[in-house]
From Swiss-Prot:
Transmembrane segments: none
Extent of the signal sequence: 1-18
Subunit structure: Monomer.
The protein's role, per its UniProt record: Lysozymes have primarily a bacteriolytic function; those in tissues and body fluids are associated with the monocyte-macrophage system and enhance the activity of immunoagents.
Swiss-Prot/TrEMBL catalytic activity: Hydrolysis of (1->4)-beta-linkages between N-acetylmuramic acid and N-acetyl-D-glucosamine residues in a peptidoglycan and between N-acetyl-D-glucosamine residues in chitodextrins
Record-given protein name: Lysozyme C
Gene3D superfamilies: 1.10.530.10
Molecular function terms, GO-annotated: glycosaminoglycan binding; identical protein binding; lysozyme activity
Chief location bin: secreted
UniProt keywords, alphabetically: Antimicrobial, Bacteriolytic enzyme, Disulfide bond, Glycosidase, Hydrolase, Secreted, Signal
Limits of the C-type lysozyme domain: 19-147
Gene Ontology cellular component annotations, sorted alphabetically: cytoplasm; extracellular space
Annotated gene: LYZ
Amino acid sequence: MRSLLILVLCFLPLAALGKVYGRCELAAAMKRLGLDNYRGYSLGNWVCAAKFESNFNTHATNRNTDGSTDYGILQINSRWWCNDGRTPGSKNLCNIPCSALLSSDITASVNCAKKIASGGNGMNAWVAWRNRCKGTDVHAWIRGCRL
């Protein structure tokens, strides 16, 4: 029993860091944070992007060949948008540590995503959105959700 308690206490901090959202749960959180129709992109676009970027996992990270890393539910890149302390020449245009993008609270990710989408490329900045969501019926991603 004591070893089980020690094991639980060791993994407890990891559980607090990230979260895998349900589709409708994420849609509701994104809507509450102002992403529905942000810069003309419907909520379904954002949910679709999150599905194919991170599979709705706030703790997702992916290392890129250029040495940068993508972080969080929308896989925001450390070369341009956040500071992870290890990406050479990082611009940190969202002025946040990349670790903030791994939280179960997606506020930092959404605020940074708004800055990214406000740039000249809009949601085209997300490769997964371009390849998997753009031009598709993205309303399907929020169908059946009570929003």
